[in-house]
Amino acid sequence: MDITSQEGIEIIKSLSKICDVVFEDYDPGYLQSLGLGYGELSKNHPELIMTSLTAFGQDGPYRDFKSTDLVALAMGGQMHSCGYDDLPGAPPIRPYGDHGNYIASHYGLMGTLSALIYRDFSGKGQYIDASAHEACSSTTEVALPAYLYPPNKEVFRQTGRHAGTFPTAKTLCKTVDNKYLIVFRIFMDLSSWIALVKWMDLHGMAEDLADQKFKDMAANRTAGTEDGDYAMEVLRKFIATRPAEEVYRKSQELRFPWGVVRSPEENLDDPHFYEDRGMFTKIDHPELGNDVSYTYVGRPYNFKGTPWSASRAPLLAENTKKILLEDLDYSNEKISNLVSSGVIGVN
């Protein structure tokens, strides 16, 4: 839809009168310049909720600064905590994918849902000014609390583990099949430790880990000692001789919270996610041909009372005509004129 045209502006105004929420991510002030700001749209619809998601918010000195997902992660603080501590001079790195945009979208959604709940008992809508920079700055895990409260320290990057204000034991262990496991809390309880040492001893690789001092460490959950570092290195050598899945399954059997470092696509082959939990689902795409479907990531939760269903996203302009006909009572002739004049597209 051409929202710069008078006809497009009128369509937006008409739709805003009958909708619950308006989402937008234009530059600050752009919709107001077209007469489509919240003040105008809510004039005859005080229950309307409108959420604007921008890089730095609608006001302040950064209001008109440009940004990208990478900038959001850099200025928000996430990149400062991501990287390596075993490569001298290594720079911070960004997480894979558009995490900055996802974080911003989640916060925008949470604010919108909160406004909907408030409207349920107040009858009032409101305008939500969401900032990607502020969303990312609010999602730095331990970094901000560690700096704001005693001992008021900055976190530093640690390879394959949480950034922290003090060094923690290296958790990445390589396996014989060139995979990695996250291994930690080896002294979490005595029974698990004894069972782990017995398993290692079956393969002749327990060395002296059956000594009483290590049992005492497990019983007392002792960590951060030279003996603990030594035990971890013995375990690391043992893990290097075993396949990743074997160590993972056995560690879970022994009640250790370890896990395999998987690529996203490896989860597609795990029946726990694909078959038992239904995490992945096939969605039909009839617009591409008969019996054409693709596998998508599903929902990360199961509604027991209202089972979910999934379908493909609408095509661009796929529902434009239907909405104008049914919701705004436009005639077919009027819609055809809007199409021919380039105000809207239909699919």
List where the protein language model places each region.
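A structured beta-alpha segment of the ubiquitous adenosine-cofactor-binding alpha/beta core
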Residues: 1-43, 240
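Aromatic-enriched alpha-helical interface/lid elements that frame and gate functional surfaces
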Residues: 169-254, 258
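Redox-cofactor-proximal catalytic regions of oxidoreductases
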Residues: 1-14, 72-81, 292-308, 313
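Active-site-adjacent "lid/gating" segments in soluble enzymes
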Residues: 18, 32-187, 191-198
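Amphipathic terminal alpha-helices
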Residues: 333-347
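A glycine-rich dinucleotide-binding beta-alpha-beta segment and adjacent secondary-structure elements
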Residues: 253-307
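Flexible, small-/acidic-enriched active-site or ligand-binding loops
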Residues: 93, 289-337
